[in-house]
Amino acid sequence: HIEGDYLHHILHKITEGWRGQMDFYCTVYGGGIHLIDLMRWLMSEEIKEVTSMGTSIPVKNSNYKWMDTITSLLKWEKGATGKTTTCLAPVRNKFHSLNIYGTKKTFINDRPSGKLFNTAGDNVSHIKVKDPYPGMAKGDMLPDFINSIRKKNKPDVNEIDIFRVMTVCFGIWEATKKKK
């Protein structure tokens, strides 16, 4: 089982900024896509099924007419399950949660450090993972992308991966609208 959540208090960006002025804006397309992409990459397989629901409680008295929070359950082609939440309203620090629950090890992305569990039980201990979070600046991957356009090189993330993660996000939005 794997979980990835995009948690970022940016209500002002969707109620007062350009996102809220668009004919349509989906929080999964703008935020959650990053965790969905990461989970696909870590699992090395495709998501074959989604079910989703969302809420608009924090934005109900604003001009923003779309859901600010969407939670989805995912099923991978080999049977693994997952969960992703995109929430643009939590009162907390920005965080990209990633939890991987395995039968041999479990990884929990946390602050101030991640946790790696090698054993289970009541008196379980964990190894602190002290790698920097987020580990790179926001624009660090742009040079490769720009180079791939200018020099017609193959980018680190190709169009097939982009379209596959977008297909999952479209499926999440459709499931949310249909309440399935």
Report each predicted region and the residues it spans.
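A general structural signal for well-ordered alpha-helical segments in protein cores
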Residues: 35-36, 138-143, 169
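NAD(P)-dinucleotide binding in Rossmann-like oxidoreductases
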Residues: 60-67, 76-141, 158
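Predominantly a Rossmann-like dinucleotide-binding segment in NAD(P)-dependent oxidoreductases
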Residues: 1-64, 72, 179
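Secondary-structure boundary/capping signal
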Residues: 46-47, 51, 80, 153-154
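Phosphate/oxyanion-binding loops and surfaces in catalytic or ligand/nucleic-acid-binding neighborhoods
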Residues: 42-46, 103-107, 169-176
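C-terminal helix-rich "cap/oligomerization" subdomain common to oxidoreductases
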Residues: 77, 144-180
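A generic structural signal for residues located within well-ordered alpha-helices
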Residues: 31-34, 137, 160, 164
